[in-house]
UniProtKB/Swiss-Prot annotation:
Activity is slightly enhanced at pH 6.6 and pH 6.0. Retains only 10% of its maximal activity at pH 7.6 and is inactive at pH 8.0. Its EC number is 3.7.1.24. Disruption phenotype: The phlA-phlG double mutant cannot degrade DAPG. This is 2,4-diacetylphloroglucinol hydrolase. Zn(2+) binds at residues 142, 173, 283, 287. Activity is strongly reduced by pyoluteorin, an antifungal compound produced by the bacterium.
Length: 307
């Protein structure tokens, strides 16, 4: 299914119906859920903290097939990331692989029923203000996600792009049983290599794409993350790609040449990066499909158009 084409209501309803509960979480994640549940109990939005997480059965089955063939993957090169904007590009809804480098690769496409681009933008403004808000997104995995320039993020005189791009979120979250502390530096699509003309022609409604680094080495980007969202009839699609590790094309980002040695020092060899790719694929599938299940209702209760 093309990432930027028009989807019919039939496409969306078929995909939305085939949801299944996701029930396996590592022991540290189960313990985190109980702590998060206690912390959110007295918040006005506590009813949106939900234990059941449902994901598309088709996405689960694709991940169960094991790593993708390399010919079906994309690299973080400028040429490859711009393929996401081509009218005939087909984006599968889930998958992972280990690329030469080594580099972990994750791909996904998620449908948000009844969601608009405005709702999705609002979420990125609203949730960093409190850790408890962040836990709604993935109750078993999310710890906190404060924003470095919070005052700018909340400045209603600025556009969404002015508030987010050039800003950094400091995420603490479990990916599998590994607690990760990450700096997520949101950037203009063009700064990451996405072609401005293609982006406009694709009629993308927004991007929350970023470079990621380990919190204790913020000067070394170890990951490129691309999230492009587009409204369709009855909802919104989010097309995502994650690259974590070393690749020659990452050299366009200052400091990335140190990523390979830094990751190796932190215990990320080829086997660990392949495991990370799998765990990130599961994490992405769970968190965004879970967000899709409650975001329209949350926005109607707490959202403001200015955000």
């Amino acid at each position: 299914m093309a990432a930027i084409c028009q989807f019919t209501p039939k496409d969306i309803s078929m995909e939305a119906r085939n949801m299944t509960p996701f029930t396996y979480f590592s022991l540290p994640m189960q313990k985190l859920f109980l702590r998060n549940q206690a912390a959110v109990r007295n918040k006005p939005y506590a009813k949106y903290f939900r234990s059941e997480m449902r994901v598309p059965l088709s996405a689960v089955r694709k991940i169960q097939q094991g790593p993708m063939a390399l010919e079906d993957t994309l690299t973080p090169s400028i040429e490859d990331i711009n393929r996401l904007l081509e009218p005939d590009f087909v984006s599968e809804e889930s998958g992972y692989a280990l690329l030469p480098g080594p580099m972990a690769y994750v791909q996904s496409r998620k449908f948000f029923p009844g969601c608009t681009a405005q709702m999705f933008k609002w979420w990125f403004i609203w949730h960093p203000a409190e850790s408890e808000r962040y836990t709604l997104w993935f109750p078993y995995a999310h710890v906190s996600n404060p924003c470095v320039h919070h005052q700018r993020l909340c400045d209603e005189s600025l556009s969404f792009e002015e508030r987010l791009y050039g800003n950094t979120f400091c995420a603490s979250e479990y990916v599998g049983d590994r607690l990760m502390h990450l700096h997520i530096d949101f950037q203009q699509p063009a700064s990451l290599g996405l072609n401005t003309d293609l982006y406009r022609e694709a009629k993308i409604d927004g991007s929350v794409s970023a470079l990621m680094s380990l919190a204790d080495h913020p000067e070394v980007p170890v990951s490129l993350m691309v999230h492009l969202f587009k409204e369709v009839p009855d909802g919104m699609y989010l097309t995502s790609r994650y690259w974590v590790g070393a690749h020659p094309s990452m050299a366009r980002f200052p400091g990335a040449e140190k990523a390979a040695s830094l990751l190796k020092e932190n215990g990320f060899g080829e086997a660990e990066l392949e495991t990370l790719a799998y765990e990130f694929a599961v994490h992405d599938m769970c968190e965004f499909n879970h967000l899709a299940s409650f975001l329209p209702d949350l926005y109607r209760e707490f959202g403001t158009p200015a955000a």
